[in-house]
Amino acid sequence: YRFMLKELLLKNRSYRRFVQNVRITREELAELVGLTRYCASGRNAQALKYKVVADVDLCDKVFPNLAWAGYLKDWDGPEEGERPAAYLIQLLDTSIVENCLCDDGIQAQTILLGAVEKGYGGCIIKAFKNESLREVLQLPEHLKIMYVIALGKPKETVVLEEMKDGDYKYWRETDG
């Protein structure tokens, strides 16, 4: 896949359902993380790190610690077979800095744009069970979870619409 920036941005949506059995290789995940080296970094601190979660068993342990689609109250998230193929856990190394300014968002967006270029999609997740997820990932104290980036081959089609009357809430068709 090759896209111009506007095309990448339009294709880069929050995908919440995936073709779960289409795996993403560790090499592809390393390439996505590698893109962040080219991002701006406040004071050039380079304080954001990533935990790559590609193993099926570990993915299964991460999943129940995530909250999906806050505006879709009657939806508990993707079902088995629709779950992400991998996760990149964005971590702030607090031994370097206490605040990453806006670097976390810049890097998360860069990772998703890279994923789109490879034919994948993802969702940046901020709603998670922090302590439980830290335990699952066996993280040392100085690493703070900033975001969970869920990745996979999208199983859904996202339709962009102009916002009407200030209503910014997303929705889902009854058939998913």
Map each language-model feature to its residues:
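Acidic, surface-exposed loops and disordered segments
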Residues: 1-176
